[in-house]
């Protein structure tokens, strides 16, 4: 839909071109991503229910893990259902209001996840490096407060970008060459200059992603040195097993996020950017519940107790 304003025709609906311009692949992609979405939701929501119902998992580590699972479920839900609709809809239209809403919920869950990963790294640092002080330094009350702070920051941060986004007008093009309403793609088709918007994305991205990543790196560096000091091979194996999964998830998540949002314009192909976006919007939310659960003995014991019932 277009609205006339003076001599300009303002665009209020956009066309999402999706992952491919080959129509014969749409049905195949629909089936693949539907299966991925269902597995993602079952994995993450199942993990939340498991942690909620099992008293043995009512500990800070699993509280953060449950928070991460909820954040991943929100990330996937903000992107995948609309993408599935577009695979079957020849027009693939999305309104400006829907576009901004999709961006808000994605940005909110992504911001929350950055801080949750920091909390989880700190939790592992305290548990491995200061086990005797763990009940004091990471109590259930403190972990609940930290979890709440992560979600509050995640709720507030995207409002800055949404308010700036509402200042932009779209009057020339309405085609977004992407599979969701990615904010940098909206900047490309805006009529008025998005330089302030782009600057805020870079500044907030740098101030959120880089300090949180550095905190995680420092925490795990300390953990690594502590592990290497352990004489027990069993103790080393257990600690590496616990932290290795976390580091894998962090590397994938931060690597793609920083490459997308904390970098100068590089003129890279849009298809390459789509691949990076797929990692933090769809692939990582799919993998996280399995990365954290399959190597965690307490989670697996809790799952076996549920199956036996």
UniProtKB/Swiss-Prot annotation:
Biological processes per GO annotation: sensory perception of smell
UniProt KW keywords: Cell membrane, Disulfide bond, G-protein coupled receptor, Glycoprotein, Membrane, Olfaction, Receptor, Sensory transduction, Transducer, Transmembrane, Transmembrane helix
Cytoplasmic topological domain: 49-56, 123-135, 220-239, 295-309
Disulfide cysteine pairs (residue numbers): 99-191
Transmembrane segments: 28-48, 57-77, 102-122, 136-156, 199-219, 240-260, 274-294
Subcellular location: Cell membrane
GO molecular function, one term: olfactory receptor activity
Function as written in the Swiss-Prot or TrEMBL entry: Odorant receptor.
Glycosylated residues (UniProt): 7
Family recorded in the similarity comment: Belongs to the G-protein coupled receptor 1 family.
Lipid bilayer topology: Multi-pass membrane protein
Protein name: Olfactory receptor 5AC2
UniProt organism field: Homo sapiens
Protein's UniProt keywords contain Membrane: yes
Ranges of the Extracellular topological domain: 1-27, 78-101, 157-198, 261-273
Entries under InterPro entries matching the protein: GPCR_Rhodpsn, GPCR_Rhodpsn_7TM, Olfact_rcpt
């Amino acid at each position: 839909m277009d609205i006339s304003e003076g001599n300009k025709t303002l665009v209020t609906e956009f066309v999402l071109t999706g992952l491919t311009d080959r129509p014969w692949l749409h049905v195949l992609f629909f089936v693949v991503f539907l299966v991925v979405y269902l597995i993602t939701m079952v994995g993450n929501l199942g993990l939340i229910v498991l942690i909620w119902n099992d008293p043995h998992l009512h500990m800070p580590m699993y509280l953060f893990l449950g928070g991460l699972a909820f954040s991943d479920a929100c990330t996937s839900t903000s992107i995948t259902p609309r993408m599935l609709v577009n695979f079957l809809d020849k027009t693939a239209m999305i309104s400006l209001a829907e576009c901004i809403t999709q961006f808000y919920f994605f940005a909110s869950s992504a911001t929350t996840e950055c801080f949750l990963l920091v909390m989880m790294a700190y939790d592992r640092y305290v548990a491995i490096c200061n086990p005797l002080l763990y009940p004091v330094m990471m109590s259930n009350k403190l972990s609940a407060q930290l979890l709440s702070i992560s979600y509050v920051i995640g709720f507030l941060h995207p409002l800055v970008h949404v308010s700036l986004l509402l200042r932009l007008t779209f009057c020339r093009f309405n085609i977004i060459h992407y599979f969701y309403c990615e904010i940098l793609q909206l900047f490309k088709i805006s009529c008025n200059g998005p330089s302030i918007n782009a600057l805020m994305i870079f500044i907030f991205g740098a101030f959120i992603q880089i300090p949180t990543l550095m905190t995680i790196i420092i925490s795990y560096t300390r953990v690594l040195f502590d592990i290497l000091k352990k004489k027990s091979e069993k103790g080393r194996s257990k600690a590496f097993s616990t932290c290795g999964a976390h580091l894998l998830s962090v590397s994938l998540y931060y690597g793609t996020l920083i490459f997308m949002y904390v970098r100068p314009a590089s003129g890279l192909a849009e298809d390459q950017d789509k691949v990076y976006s797929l990692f933090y919007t769809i692939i990582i939310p799919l993998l996280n519940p399995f990365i954290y659960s399959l190597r965690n003995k307490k989670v697996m014991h809790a799952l076996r107790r549920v199956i036996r019932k």
